[in-house]
From Swiss-Prot:
Topology Mitochondrial matrix: residue spans: 13-270
Gene name, Swiss-Prot/TrEMBL: YME2
GO annotation, biological process: mitochondrial genome maintenance; mRNA processing
Record's keyword annotation contains Ribonucleoprotein: no
Protein name, per record: Mitochondrial escape protein 2
Lineage: Eukaryota, Fungi, Dikarya, Ascomycota, Saccharomycotina
Length: 860
């Protein structure tokens, strides 16, 4: 049979009901929430949909629904049933007596509920529906008579509405969240726009209807309001029309949200990436900088440390048991270490401890006046830029920290200690940042961001050929850290300024009251005139300013981080210029003052020079540490102390050697040999001396060693008498190198170099040891005279060249005197060379057997 044949149309409602009956034969739970189908008798029951029974916001996001549902939905189902009955009835038009809710099916995602009413026998379904709808509208009118409810409903109408369920409700809890757009799927013949409008308009304003087309078998209904689409979907879905030839299935069309911000970021990266980086940097500054500043202030003042409040009676309850426990553990560890050392080595403690504080004070009594001078300079508060100089091992750090600052209750409260040596020895940029942050108290610090920014910068440079500017150099990061530390120092310095201001105002008010009572007195000055400025306050209260102690400050170092010296010099100079803190530099490198001079060119630095301990103090210190005639004869102590001088490091090394079982002769001899080996390996080695980093002359070093082996010091002018030191640049370079490595030290008068002495007393004995060694003496003394011969030969060559030039002239009678002068110079230089050669021959005849004494030059 040919011709058009209508497709088979199944009845949606009957099919679903049959499927449910077939599937639920053995099930006990046949509720609508489980099966998704709401059964009802159309003759005796009606199903209505009430919207806004639940708050609508819970259906927006799953997280919001999960966390807010327990708070917003604390009402029970019985409460909601009663609420629906109250909304469906009025005093003027109550519901029939036998009307009751037989089933209440919540639909929380859509903020509504399906309510099944049993229709009383004396009432029809239509009458009951009309009565409920009219009562609901009347209740809404009464609700809006309240001005607040009326204004609220203008912006967001949350009063429930009621609609009859025309189709077969599908109660599902899928993640299909409500939207104003509905997709209409037709099972059978589709409906026209007019038919769709007629069917859906009752639920709210419709923005547009997109009917079925050849390319799209579904229709789209776009409502103006979300609640209209929700009501239409729950009431119309499953409806059968045209004599069950057409069935409608409705679904929400997800809202396609356009993120304009993300689109702008993706499409305009050249603008957005720098803007995002700037925003993140700003947020980081606003969030982390106050935290870092607080940690810096805590690091300097120890405001929140138990040690600060140890005298408080409440803190004592916790502090003293804690300190006792820590001391007990430390003493236990020391006891175990000492016993293990005695068992394995058979000897006692080899380390010099501080058990006898009087032994240490012997050395510091000589520096008492300098300690007083340092404190006086701090309290004078006049450009407090102090430099404490001294050789290594002279106790500069203890002098400043332990004996000057920590002995003063006011000064020790605000001390920031910076060790340049730890900063310079950092192996990487991140290590330098971490070490600096640790010493400043700068926390938190994120060094991993440097690696990420450098990686991104490298990638951008590879793609575009230009750097992105995201990464910062270590100098910039250090400057930022010092800048934040400056703010913290200012807050610390002015921490008591507000109290001073309030006290001044109170005193002024008291005087004002007295003046008002006594009319004869003249009015005093105003409060604002009496309160001094912050700068003047800091000038009058030097104890309020924090103290910056910079240790191991040098001119340069061998590492890649020597720029830290210049940065610290510039930073501390700005602190002194702004009168914000006292600055104390501790250095053994005289050349380091150049950085300070560059930072403060017009500033005269206050300098304290620390020398070694006196012979008497050194002798008493060593004997008090040994205090055992079996280890050393006290009568021969002077013999061994004299080569060591008063250098604390050498004295302690000598004591350790004796306590370890060496004799005094062996201990001193070994120390001198080590110093001699250090000198020959580093300074008298021609290979090392010719390197680019070594700017000294070996022959000059040998000549200076000979001077100092015979004398404690000598005049600087003595060097100018030797032709080897005629070149001032080379001479100054050699002297600077020797001073840096502590072989020599300078004495200046009015800033002018006057005398040269041995830097480390042990080196004087080493000089004598080397010169007393015939083999070493022959080697370097020969080299010394060869250098002198080279200088004289160069001089002769220049003079001969001058004679050759004069001889080429046509008339030389006017230059006769000049020729005679040059000739005499050549003869003198030649005679000098002959003398030097004779010296070399005499040196070559010396026996290479060494003398037994290093305390003098004795050749047999």
């Amino acid at each position: 049979m040919s011709g058009y044949q209508r497709p088979f149309i199944r009845n949606y409602a009957s099919d679903v009901e049959d499927l449910k009956k077939e599937a639920d034969r053995l099930e006990t739970d046949k509720s609508a929430s489980t099966t998704g189908v709401l059964d009802y008798e159309k003759q005796s029951e009606v199903v209505l949909y009430f919207d806004h029974i639940y708050p609508m916001p819970i259906s927006g996001l799953s997280l919001k629904r999960k966390f807010l549902s327990p708070i917003q939905n604390r009402v029970t189902t019985d409460d909601l049933k009663q609420k629906v009955l109250d909304l469906s009835s009025t005093d003027s038009n109550p519901l029939p007596e036998n009307t009751k809710i037989s089933e209440f099916v919540p639909l929380k995602r859509d903020a509504g509920a399906f309510v099944k009413f049993e229709v009383p026998p004396e009432t029809t379904c239509k009458e009951l529906i009309n009565q409920i709808v009219s009562n609901l509208e009347e209740n809404e009118v009464q609700h809006n008579k309240n001005i607040f409810n009326y204004v609220k409903n203008l912006f967001w109408n949350k009063f429930p509405k009621c609609y009859q369920v025309k189709g077969t409700p599908w109660i599902e809890d899928l993640r299909r969240y409500p939207s104003p757009k509905l997709k209409v799927i037709f099972e059978g013949d589709p409906l026209t726009e007019e038919e769709l409008y007629l069917l859906f308009r009752r639920y709210g304003l419709i923005v547009d209807i997109i009917p079925v087309s050849s390319s799209n078998p579904t229709a789209t209904i776009i409502f103006k309001y979300l609640r209209s689409a929700v009501c239409a979907k729950n009431c119309i879905t499953g409806i059968s029309l045209n004599s069950s030839m057409t069935t409608l299935h409705l679904q929400y069309i997800p809202i396609e949200r356009v993120n304009y911000l993300m689109d702008f970021i993706v499409n305009h990266q050249k603008i957005t990436i720098p803007a995002i980086v700037a925003l993140l940097a700003t947020l980081a500054v606003l969030i982390f900088d106050p935290i870092r500043q607080l940690f810096i202030e805590q690091h300097i003042t120890h405001k929140y440390s138990l040690e600060t409040y140890k005298d408080n009676r409440y803190v004592k309850v916790v502090y003293y048991p804690y300190r006792s426990l820590v001391q007990w553990l430390n003493n236990s560890y020391d006891y175990i270490d000492e016993k293990l050392n005695q068992v394995y080595e058979g000897k006692g403690d080899l380390e010099v401890t501080s058990e006898d504080s009087e032994n240490i004070n012997i050395l510091w009594n000589e520096r008492f006046e300098k300690i007083k001078q340092l404190k006086l300079w701090i309290y004078e508060n006049i450009n407090t830029f102090i430099v404490v100089k001294g050789p290594k091992g002279s106790g500069k750090e203890e002098f400043v920290l332990d004996h000057t600052l920590n002995n003063d209750e006011k000064l020790k409260r605000k001390v920031l200690y910076i060790d340049c040596d730890a900063l310079v020895k950092a192996r990487s940029d991140n290590g330098l940042i971490k070490t600096t942050a640790r010493q400043l108290g700068y926390f938190p610090v994120f060094t991993w961001t440097n690696s990420i920014s450098q990686f991104v910068d490298l990638g951008v440079q590879g793609l575009t050929g230009q750097k992105s500017g995201l990464s910062e150099s270590k100098e910039t990061q250090l400057k930022n850290m010092f800048s934040l530390t400056t703010q913290a120092l200012r807050n610390i310095a002015l921490s008591d300024y507000e109290d001073y201001r309030n006290d001044t105002i109170k005193q002024q008010k008291r005087r004002t009251r007295k003046t008002e009572n006594n009319t004869d007195e003249k009015p005093s000055i105003s409060v604002e005139e009496e309160i001094i400025k912050e700068e003047d306050y800091l000038q009058q209260h030097p104890e309020a300013k924090p103290i910056i102690v910079v240790n191991n400050f040098q001119r340069k170092s061998d590492g890649n981080n020597d720029m830290i010296y210049k940065l610290i010099a510039e930073w501390t100079s700005s602190l002194v210029q702004s009168n914000m803190s006292h600055v104390i530099f501790i250095t053994h490198d005289v050349g380091s003052v150049q950085h300070l001079t560059d930072s403060l060119p017009n500033q005269v630095f206050k300098t304290i020079s620390l020398s070694d301990a006196s012979q008497r103090s050194a002798k008493q210190y060593v004997w008090n540490q040994l205090n055992d005639p079996s280890l050393m004869n006290p009568d021969s102590l002077d013999k061994y102390i004299e080569p060591l001088g008063g250098r604390m490091l050498d004295l302690q090394a000598f004591i350790r050697r004796i306590k370890s079982g060496e004799s005094a002769n062996d201990a001193l001899s070994e120390m001198v040999n080590q110093a001699s080996e250090q000198i020959t390996t580093f300074f008298l080695n021609n290979t090392v001396a010719n390197e680019s980093d070594s700017n000294w002359n070996t022959a000059q070093v040998w000549a200076i060693m000979k001077f100092l082996s015979e004398n404690d010091s000598f005049e600087y002018n003595e060097l100018s008498k030797i032709s080897l030191f005629k070149s001032s640049n080379e001479t100054l370079a050699t002297l600077a190198a020797l001073e840096k490595h502590d072989l020599i030290s300078f004495t200046r008068e009015k800033g002018v170099l006057s005398r040269i002495s041995t830097g480390r007393p042990l080196y004087k004995a080493a000089f004598k040891e080397l010169i007393n060694d015939r083999k070493v003496y022959k080697l370097y003394e020969t080299d010394y005279y060869n250098n002198l011969i080279t200088i004289e030969s160069t001089k002769i060559f220049k003079l001969e060249d001058e004679i050759n030039k004069i001889s080429r002239l046509s008339d030389i009678k006017y230059l006769k005197n000049r020729l005679e002068y040059v000739s005499s110079k050549i003869n003198t230089a030649t005679e000098t060379i002959m003398k030097y050669e004779e010296k070399i021959k005499e040196i070559g005849k010396l026996n290479e057997k060494s003398s037994s004494s290093f305390l003098g030059i004795k050749f047999n």
